């Protein structure tokens, strides 16, 4: 189970802006895979306003993605209460993964270039990780995350 749909040559992400019809259908929600499925891939935890996801093929160990339940492209398009809840869930996910894995830093990224449904990437960063000194490169081959690692993430996110 991956988190993202794969693009050309198995690369994750990438923009579909150069395909205007496809982009419009994704952006208006009529072709959004999250909306069509009713939830994103790899759901670990469902919260009131978001899903927190991961997968068995991820950019870095401990990666999480927080996906809004509302189909919007930009955070500012959310109604105020949902906007606050979205940010709170991003911080909740980051804090929980930081407690579990003790990374040196947690990075956050927002794009929507290939999937225009609001989501936030949460990347724990570790000394010696393959992206030291730079951002996460979505074109790099994903790393494997075991079912046991996913279960630990799930338990951490659901613990009180």
Regions found by a protein language model. Name each.
Residues 1-160:
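HIT superfamily nucleotide-processing domains
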């Amino acid at each position: 189970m991956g988190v993202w749909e794969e693009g050309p040559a198995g690369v994750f992400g990438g923009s579909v802006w150069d395909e205007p019809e496809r982009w419009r259908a994704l952006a208006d929600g009529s072709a959004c895979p999250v909306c069509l499925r009713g939830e994103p891939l790899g759901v670990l935890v469902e919260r009131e306003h978001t899903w927190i996801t991961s997968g068995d093929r991820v950019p870095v160990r401990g990666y999480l993605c927080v996906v809004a339940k509302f189909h919007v492209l930009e955070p500012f398009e959310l109604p105020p209460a949902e906007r606050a809840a979205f940010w709170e869930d991003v911080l909740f996910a980051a804090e929980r993964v930081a407690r579990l894995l003790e990374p040196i830093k947690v990075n956050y990224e927002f794009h929507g270039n290939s999937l225009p449904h609001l989501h936030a990437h949460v990347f724990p960063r570790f000394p010696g990780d393959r992206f030291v000194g730079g951002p996460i490169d979505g074109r790099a081959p994903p790393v494997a995350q075991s079912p046991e690692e996913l279960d630990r993430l799930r338990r951490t996110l659901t613990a009180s």
